[in-house]
Amino acid sequence: PNPQPNPQPQPDPKPQPKPQPDPKPNPDPKPNPQPQPSSGVFDFEWIEKVDKSYAVHVTKTLNGVTLDATARTDTQEQNQDYAIQGKGLVLDGRRGQITITFPEGVKSISFDYKAFLAGNKKREILVSGGGISDIVSVGTDKQTYTKTLNKTGNVEITIKGNSGSKQFVIDNIKWTR
C-alpha cells in the first residue's frame, strides 16, 4: 500500500480568541461632574473664633454656595446667651454684613433672626439682591424670614442691619436651588 502523506492540520472551524490580559483600571479616568446638592444650610457651628468684635471675617462654601461675612461671632452679653441654635452672627445698622453667592441660581432662601440684647430699640434687617429689597422688623423672639426667588445664573444676596438698627442675631441660613 502507498503510504499516505501526513495530512496537513486543518484550521479549527471556530478560531479561538486570543487570551486577553487582565483589564487594568483606566489610570486617568475622566470624572463625571456630579450635580451639586439642591439645598443647604449655613448653621455657623463651624465658626472657631468667638469674638465680641464686629469685624470678625468668616467665610464658608457649601454645596457650591459661598457665604462671606463680617460680624460679631460672640452671641453672649451680660451673662446671657442670645443665640438662636448654637452659634450665630451678630449684626447691627453700622457694622457687619453677610453676602451669599449662588453661582447656579436660587429658588428660595430663609434664615432665623432675633434681637440681641433686650430693649425696645429699633432693629431692622435689610435683605437685598436677586430682586429682593426687604426691610424686616426684629423682635425679641426667634422669627424666620423666607423668600421665594426662582432665579437662575449668578445671584448674590446681602443681609445687613438697616441704617440705625440695633443688634440682632442671624442663624440657620437655608436655601434651595
Can you say where each PLM-predicted feature lies in the sequence?
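Short beta-strands within extracellular/lumenal beta-sheet-rich domains
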Residues: 81-109, 142-144
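Solvent-exposed strand-to-loop "edge" motifs in beta-rich extracellular domains
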Residues: 47, 103-106, 112-118
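Terminal, low-complexity interaction segments
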Residues: 40-58, 120, 129-177
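Extracellular beta-strand-rich recognition modules
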Residues: 100, 108-113, 154-162
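Extracellular/lumenal ectodomain signal focusing on beta-strand-rich modules
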Residues: 46, 64, 88, 108, ...
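Extracellular carbohydrate-recognition regions
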Residues: 27-69
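Short beta-strand elements bearing conserved aromatic residues within extracellular beta-rich modules
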Residues: 125-127
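Ser/Thr/Gly/Pro-rich low-complexity, disordered linker/stalk segments of secreted
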Residues: 1-38
